[in-house]
Amino acid sequence: MSNPSIVIASAARTAVGSFNGAFGNTLAHELGAAAIKAVLERAGVEAGEVDEVILGQVLPAGEGQNPARQAAMKAGLPQEKTAWGMNQLCGSGLRAVALGMQQIATGDAKVIVAGGMESMSMAPHCAHLRGGVKMGDYKMIDTMIKDGLTDAFYGYHMGITAENVARKWQLTREEQDEFALASQNKAEAAQKAGRFADEIVPFVVKTRKGDVNVDQDEYIRHGATLDSIAKLRPAFDKEGTVTAGNASGLNDGAAAALLMTEAEAARRGIQPLARIVSWATAGVDPQIMGTGPIPASRKALEKAGWSVADIELVEANEAFAAQACAVNKDLGWDPSIVNVNGGAIAIGHPIGASGARVLNTLLFEMKRRGVSKGLATLCIGGGMGVAMCVERL
């Protein structure tokens, strides 16, 4: 018996906020709730019809029990429905969609909301004090750096893995800066043209000066120039090539997708954004974690029965320009179809949400262009990648 066709009935995301920016005091589950509500409203599905919510999140410390459940309840799902969070680092938001697809394919659910959420701004500092401190100072650990951005095997920052990739793939500082500039310029043009408007659900932030409606990505740098990027010093290795300008940011945001079978969508009169054709995850050396999309994309393409030449649009997360350039070179796809509206270097990288964010951006741009076959992929800390092939019906 063949598996049923699983479709993405609707998708939505919040804007991406800068570190300590518009969402600086907003908890991740509040952003997640907004994305959940939006996908239900866009598809005309009642909250009580959702079987389960699955949300990726990398930095849940201090947010209370099961932030995914908090997001689901805040979005109006009845208490009888369930929700849970998962963590595959930067791939979490896309892996959550794959998990939702699997639950529907096995008959364990009919309707799933899946995606990711993250507040890097609200990630707390912590200290291990249960054994007591007899005297003297005690070091606080930044959970954002420790749990989100430091390699667990070699003990260094993700930026060093990008330096490793740059050396192994012989990528110059100039190549990386030019890639970063292109990302910024494409994102600026897309934002000015309103091309992100269909993706983004406005989110109201309450401030002492009144309510602020956040409906634009905050991190995109308008007017970026090669000269301004080239002036930045290396951020992780003083002799290196990776800078704050050719790396993604620290960001806040959420994104979600509503999943069901193609038959269920037809029964409800819903025109899906796309069907999920295949997905895959793969491991690589943690020292070059940014190359994870290379084997993951190849596996997903093989499972789909596609070749690289079949792909009409790609969203490949830009953790760093170095790894993004290496992925493009090794996979050999047409760079003109990759991140056509800019990527994470410009838009930002709220780590647990980014997988669902790139999927959202891919789906809406495929619809806008009228193309059929697309691929979303991300590198993952610890030496992994995840990829998904989708097809418009």
From Swiss-Prot:
GO terms for biological process: poly-hydroxybutyrate biosynthetic process. CDD domains: thiolase. It comes from the Bacteria. Its main location: cytoplasm. Keywords: Acyltransferase, Cytoplasm, PHB biosynthesis, Transferase. It is found in: Cytoplasm. Its EC number is 2.3.1.9. One of its GO terms (molecular function) is acetyl-CoA C-acetyltransferase activity. Pathway: Biopolymer metabolism; poly-(R)-3-hydroxybutanoate biosynthesis; Metabolic intermediate biosynthesis; (R)-mevalonate biosynthesis; (R)-mevalonate from acetyl-CoA: step 1/3. The active site is at 90 (acyl-thioester intermediate), 349 (proton acceptor), 379 (proton acceptor). It catalyses: 2 acetyl-CoA = acetoacetyl-CoA + CoA. GO terms for cellular component: cytoplasm. It is an enzyme of class 2 (transferase). Pfam families: Thiolase_C, Thiolase_N. Belongs to the thiolase-like superfamily. Thiolase family. PANTHER family: ACETYL-COA ACETYLTRANSFERASE, CYTOSOLIC, ACETYL-COA C-ACYLTRANSFERASE. Homotetramer. This is Acetyl-CoA acetyltransferase. The lineage of its organism: Bacteria, Pseudomonadati, Pseudomonadota, Alphaproteobacteria, Hyphomicrobiales. The gene is phaA.
